[in-house]
Every structure is written in structure tokens, then in C-alpha cells.
Regions:
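N-terminal export signals
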Residues: 2-22
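Substrate-binding cleft of extracellular glycoside hydrolase catalytic domains
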Residues: 33, 37-42, 57-144, 150
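Long, well-ordered alpha-helical scaffolding segments within enzyme catalytic domains
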Residues: 145-163
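Sec/Tat signal peptide C-region and signal peptidase I cleavage site
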Residues: 23-27
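Aromatic-lined carbohydrate-recognition surfaces of secreted/lumenal glycan-active proteins
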Residues: 162-175
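Anion (oxyanion) recognition and catalysis
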Residues: 48, 83-84, 157, 161
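Functionally critical loop-and-helix segments that line ligand-binding/catalytic clefts
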Residues: 29-49, 174-233
Length: 233
């Protein structure tokens, strides 16, 4: 297991070890690091020792064939552990993937998934004002965006309201969502995004996937770009 914090000199602030290892942004220094993961639950001690400020956690069920996703969904004891140890929590939602991706179902799917996501968010102790990041974990064409992804996000907004919907997507899809007034928070992934580009509207940016472990669990690294990034209150 890689101990990120060991790479940072003593006395440096929380998150410095991960910041030193994460790919740099050309436009501004990140405000810290969040980890996202699905294969298990990482305790607050291990998460803090990694140098992360907190975690982006799933408020979605395991999909068929996803028995390995032992960390989905976040449960109240885990959330209490993180919160009581001063770590930040952000909610995200993704059930299907690839041919079963949630957004392929359009608005009706958005409504159904938003309802389930909110149930799990509340059950884990998520705050009423915090958003859930709905996932567009793909590189959709403009036609796919207009016919499926945008209606999917509208379904989310119909349930949660505009202010509580975040969008996990590539830079191009974030741009389209902004043009359509969809989503209040944005978490960028790099599939289909221009190399080295960070969308200026992004609150979070996923900069590394499937390369490191914390507490024996595979993690992705995300840079915090804005002071309010959808964290639970």
C-alpha cells in the first residue's frame, strides 16, 4: 500500500502528500484532494493518513455483476466515521455503465435514479442542501447529449431541484450542460476531454484513475478546484 503522506515533509497541511503526486493544473493550484472508490470502505484513519481531505462516495446500489463493489453505497457508520474525524464527503451516483449507463434511459431514468440516489444519500446522513453528482461516465456525441444525457439531467433536476444536481462528465459535456442551464456543480473526468485541459466551471477534476491503493482499496484522485464543491455541511 502506498502511503501518500510519507512523501510529504512533516508539518505540511492535510492533502499535501497527494497534491505532490497528482498531475499539476496549469491554471491554478488545487485546494486539496478527494479520493473516490467503490471496492470497499476506507476508514477515516487511512484516508487522513493518505493526505486526502475526504472522499467522493457513491449513493447508488451495486449493479448486477458488481459484487466486488463492497463500498457501494455509503452507509451511515462510514459517513459518521469520516465526518467525526473532520473529513469531507461528497455524494455521487452511478448504477449502470457502458451499455447499461444510467443516462441512456433519458428523463425517465433520471427521475428514477435521482429518487433512489436521494434515498441513499439521506440514509447515510447526507445533508439536505448537498448535491449529488449524476454520472455521464462516457464521451457522448452532441446528438447523444441532446437526446439522452440532457433529458437524464433534467430528470434529476425534476426530483432534486437545480441547486442539488451535480454533473460528472468530460469537459465538452460540461460545456453543453452549462449552455442548457443544467447542473450547479461539475466534476470533470478526462475521457474525451482535451489533454491537460481543466474546464473553468469544474468544481472537481478527476486526474488519475486505478493507479493507487489506500487501506488496500483502489482509489482515484480528484483535485478540489473551488471552496464549495458539493461537500456535505
Amino acid at each position: 500500500m502506498l502511503k501518500y503522506a510519507a512523501a510529504a515533509p512533516a508539518g505540511l497541511g492535510l492533502g499535501t502528500g497527494l497534491l505532490a503526486l497528482a498531475p499539476p493544473r496549469a491554471d491554478a493550484a488545487p485546494l486539496g484532494i478527494l479520493l473516490d472508490y467503490a471496492a470497499g470502505v476506507i476508514g477515516a484513519g487511512d484516508l487522513r493518513a493518505s493526505g486526502a481531505l475526504g472522499a467522493i462516495r457513491y449513493v447508488s446500489d451495486r449493479r448486477p455483476g458488481g459484487a466486488w463493489m463492497l463500498g457501494k453505497p455509503i452507509q451511515l457508520p462510514e459517513a459518521r466515521d469520516l465526518y467525526q474525524n473532520g473529513l469531507k464527503i461528497v455524494s455521487c451516483y452511478q448504477y449502470g455503465k457502458q451499455d447499461t449507463a444510467d443516462w441512456l434511459g433519458g428523463q425517465n431514468a433520471g427521475v428514477a435514479h435521482a429518487k433512489r440516489g436521494w434515498q441513499l444519500h439521506v440514509a447515510a446522513g447526507g445533508s439536505n442542501g448537498a448535491p449529488i453528482y449524476a454520472s455521464i461516465d462516457d464521451n457522448p456525441s452532441y446528438d447523444q447529449y441532446k437526446s439522452q444525457a440532457a433529458p437524464y439531467l433534467r430528470g434529476w433536476e425534476a426530483v432534486l431541484g437545480h441547486q442539488r444536481v451535480g454533473v460528472y462528465a468530460n469537459a465538452r459535456t460540461i460545456d453543453w450542460a452549462l449552455q442548457d442551464g443544467l447542473g450547479s456543480y461539475f466534476w470533470q473526468h478526462n475521457w474525451g476531454s482535451p489533454q491537460g485541459f481543466t474546464h473553468p466551471a469544474a468544481h472537481l477534476h478527476q486526474v488519475e484513475i486505478d493507479k493507487r491503493n489506500v487501506g488496500g482499496i483502489g482509489v482515484d484522485i480528484n483535485q478540489i478546484l473551488k471552496p464549495r464543491f458539493g461537500q456535505w455541511d
